[in-house]
């Protein structure tokens, strides 16, 4: 393919994507894919082609085979999981990143990649109202950032002994603390960082599903009495199930008293802190050691773009640094080598999409959109509160509303069957997509707002469909 053919085919692909996005915004596809397991693969040739194939035929396969196998995360009727916005400016940034084909092994390998990532992370820091004490880097996902945080915590607790001698260097079991509402990535990070699942303590939550600081204090004291080594606390700002917010100020008081690392997982909810009126939700954040939030979720920077902030970058670099001779340069003492800020040696030019998003939309437009999403959640919460037979199961600090329809006389497994039944009918209709989740030992339904194209009319239509399906025959 020469540059002229690339130009011609590139226009064709951009047109295809633009048409697809317009069709998604109009609701022309079922929101959740209806394909059966294995259906997409079975529709495609099992062996690779020997000769080149024309793009027209490839785009036909894309439209007829691939798209039906896609769940449409940018559909305005998508209320499942969490928002994972892909703003068009960020899409172009991703395209430019791939076209520039930069590989960030060190500063010299791509000075622009390194310095734009520093800048984009610092822009976001300013937008969030964080102090200059924080330094940021872009990781792929919050799972990776949490793993890096726990490795840093491990090395601080062992005075870098684990890095030198492995897990055998610690004479006492190292303990990690997180609430029952924390993300599953915390357990995986503890496993991969060598703590082991048995050394993750699940701290009880209060009636708002937030970690109880006094319970954390008791758990730490119990471990110390047993001769264990408390190491790190992972607090959550915006839990996956209910967007519960752990009390960072109180938790930080406990971690300071015991010299524990405090990592804050604000993967989805952190974007809300570009709104000054939301920042009280993470009061105490300046006392944390590390923080992760994902601009590829609510903000719109396209997956994957997860920002990891630390207060002690020198410690991070010491923990993560490798310095083979073939990567050393004369500039090393004057620049940031991002290979030492995380796990991978190389990195994509992820900063381009975040930089383009912020420049093309501006802070004001981003704030406006997030405020609209918060209003959608407040509207639905009020409707649920006023409707007979409906229960709102958790506070609504941000954009997720947790609900259950409870017909008279229905409880236990019968109520679970009812809940799963009406949400399944909504999802199968193709007119909306919701995800159920367990709260305690019973099923409920999460309504998560945040898709860029969602307007009030879509929220009204969803509530109407929820009532139709749940109240049918009750």
Residue ranges and their predicted role:
Residues 88-171, 177-179, 185-186:
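Well-ordered mid-protein domain cores that form the structural environment of catalytic cofactors
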Residues 1-133, 424, 428, 432, ...:
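N-terminal entrance/gating region of PLP-dependent enzymes' catalytic architecture
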Residues 141, 145-317:
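Conserved PLP-enzyme active-site core in the AAT-like
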Residues 395, 400, 428-446:
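Conserved PLP cofactor-binding pocket of PLP-dependent enzymes
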Residues 436-474:
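PLP-dependent enzyme catalytic core of the Aspartate aminotransferase-like
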Residues 392-426:
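Conserved PLP-binding catalytic core of the aspartate aminotransferase-like
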């Amino acid at each position: 393919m020469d540059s002229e053919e690339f130009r011609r085919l590139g226009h064709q692909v951009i047109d295809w994507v633009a048409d697809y996005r317009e069709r998604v915004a109009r609701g022309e596809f079922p929101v959740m894919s209806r394909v059966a397991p294995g259906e997409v693969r079975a529709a495609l040739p099992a062996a690779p082609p020997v000769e080149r194939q024309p793009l027209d035929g490839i785009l036909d396969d894309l439209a007829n085979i691939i798209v039906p196998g896609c769940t449409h995360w940018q559909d305005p009727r998508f209320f499942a999981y969490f928002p994972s916005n892909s703003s068009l400016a960020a899409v172009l940034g991703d395209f430019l990143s791939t076209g520039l084909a930069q590989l960030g092994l060190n500063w010299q390998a791509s000075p622009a990649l390194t310095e734009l990532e520093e800048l984009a992370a610092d822009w976001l820091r300013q937008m969030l109202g964080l102090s200059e004490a924080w330094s940021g880097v872009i990781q792929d996902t919050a799972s990776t950032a949490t793993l890096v945080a726990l490795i840093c915590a491990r090395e601080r607790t062992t005075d870098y002994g684990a890095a030198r001698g492995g897990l055998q260097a610690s004479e006492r079991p190292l303990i990690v603390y997180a609430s029952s509402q924390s993300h599953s990535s915390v357990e995986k990070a503890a496993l991969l960082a060598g703590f082991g699942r048995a050394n993750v303590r699940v701290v009880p939550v209060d009636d708002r599903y937030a970690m109880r600081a006094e319970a954390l204090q008791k758990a730490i004291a119990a471990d110390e009495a047993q001769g264990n080594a408390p190491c790190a606390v992972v607090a959550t700002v915006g839990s996956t199930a209910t967007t519960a917010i752990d009390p960072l100020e109180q938790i930080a008081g406990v971690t300071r008293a015991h010299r524990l690392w405090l990592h804050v997982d604000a993967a989805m909810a952190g974007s809300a802190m570009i709104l000054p009126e939301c920042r009280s939700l993470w009061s105490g954040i300046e006392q944390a050691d590390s923080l992760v939030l994902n601009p590829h979720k609510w903000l719109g920077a396209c997956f994957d773009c997860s920002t990891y902030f630390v207060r002690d970058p020198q410690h991070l670099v010491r923990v993560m640094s490798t310095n083979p001779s073939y990567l050393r340069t004369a500039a090393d003492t004057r620049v940031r080598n991002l290979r030492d800020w995380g796990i991978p040696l190389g990195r994509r030019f992820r900063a381009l999409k975040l930089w383009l998003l912020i420049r093309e939309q501006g802070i004001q437009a981003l704030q406006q959109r997030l405020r609209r999403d918060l209003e959608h959640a407040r509207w639905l919460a009020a409707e649920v509160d006023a409707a007979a037979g409906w229960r709102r199961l958790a506070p609504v600090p941000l954009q997720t509303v947790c609900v259950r329809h409870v017909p008279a006389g229905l409880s236990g497994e019968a109520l679970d069957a009812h809940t799963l039944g009406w949400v399944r009918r909504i999802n199968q209709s193709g007119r909306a997509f919701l995800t159920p989740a367990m709260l305690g030992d019973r099923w409920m339904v999460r309504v998560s707002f945040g898709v860029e194209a969602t307007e009030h009319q879509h929220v009204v239509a969803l509530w109407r469909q929820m009532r139709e399906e749940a109240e049918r025959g009750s």
